Amino acid sequence: MIPIPSSVRVWIATGYTDMRRGMQGLALTVQEQLKRDPHAGDLYIFRGRRGDLAKILWHDGIGLSLYAKRLDRGKFIWPSASDGAVSISAAQMAYMLEGIDWRNPQTTWRPKSAG
């Protein structure tokens, strides 16, 4: 995982996002739907309808970055609100990206082999 400074605020975009969107499309979503500045240095996490793919949009002061993570098994735990954004800590984000319920951390299934 890319080291994220502790000053960065992490936002989960609640609801579902069209995962065909790229960097510019997600930045537009942040600006129009979440009413926030995508270039302000905050980190935004989006999830698709199936729940196993998350995309992270972050402007680090130099440029805009887009990261993606797909879980081999299970789904990302997502807030139940259908509109807006929910703020979480960097530690909670790390749990989420490992497939662990960030609201109540417990380990989950891990693959034993690649094939």
Give residue spans per PLM region.
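Polybasic/polar functional segments that serve as interface/processing modules
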Residues: 1-115
